[in-house]
Amino acid sequence: MTTVSMRDMLQAGVHFGHQTRYWNPKMKPFIFGARNGVHIINLEHTVPMFNEALAFISNVASKKGKVLFVGTKRAASEAIKEAAISCDQYYVDNRWLGGMLTNWKTVRQSIKRLKDLESQSVDGTFDKLTKKEALMRTRELEKLEKSLGGIKNMGGLPDVIFVIGADHEHIAIKEANNLGIPVVAVVDTNSSPDGINYIVPGNDDAMRAIRLYAESVAAAAKAGRGQDLAVQAEQDGFVEAE
């Protein structure tokens, strides 16, 4: 089972919150104190809460569930994308488009358009167009890929969303809440934990902390998927008796 230790979190700077004047009082239960005007997050809470979240994600993946990684802040986008790809899951790393979950029917049409354009770009269709038309379609393809590339193969709504930066991604969290999709989110001292099923109190700006969260969630999803594949293989009779 994937777990993260107190040492891992300390080394990554998970315990450093925001300046005290920007705090959200709802995060008080998770704050240890303050140092030099900066809130210090109590990792005695964060460690078990994050490990509980990882166990949940692993369980979702073990049932062929879809995990959607969400992190559109500059500090988070690259780590989110890499982690999602590494565990064969899905991501939104550029900008959360309103209705991405709650208006899935429309999003699905845009994904179909994206896939049509991808096909046209490789089957020679673009070559038969005028230079201007080909350029317009190329730009449309690039724009759609940037917005929807991480979810184009999701094939439906996710079973859980993992969010870096609760404040920044409040629209995604609200949409998930409306649809009853569980939310796992990293919540800094300046953010609200409302609407989050699995709260991970921690720094949501430091690159090392973000990579620790993202890579741990990816490892948990992979471990869960491995359990699923092992069960499937056993059912298919591929596992030899020792």
UniProtKB/Swiss-Prot annotation:
Q: Which Gene3D superfamilies match?
A: Glucose-6-phosphate isomerase like protein, domain 1, Helix hairpin bin
Q: Where are the transmembrane segments?
A: none
List the SUPFAM superfamilies hit by this protein, alphabetically.
Answer: Ribosomal protein S2
One function term, GO molecular function aspect: structural constituent of ribosome
A Gene Ontology biological process term: translation
Give the Pfam families listed for this entry. Ribosomal_S2
Against InterPro entries, the record matches this protein to: Ribosomal_uS2, Ribosomal_uS2_bac/mit/plastid, Ribosomal_uS2_CS, Ribosomal_uS2_flav_dom_sf
GO CC annotation: cytosolic small ribosomal subunit
Q: Which NCBIfam families does the record cross-reference, listed alphabetically?
A: rpsB_bact (TIGR01011)
What protein name applies here? Small ribosomal subunit protein uS2
The species this protein was found in: Shewanella loihica (strain ATCC BAA-1088 / PV-4)
Q: Which gene encodes it?
A: rpsB
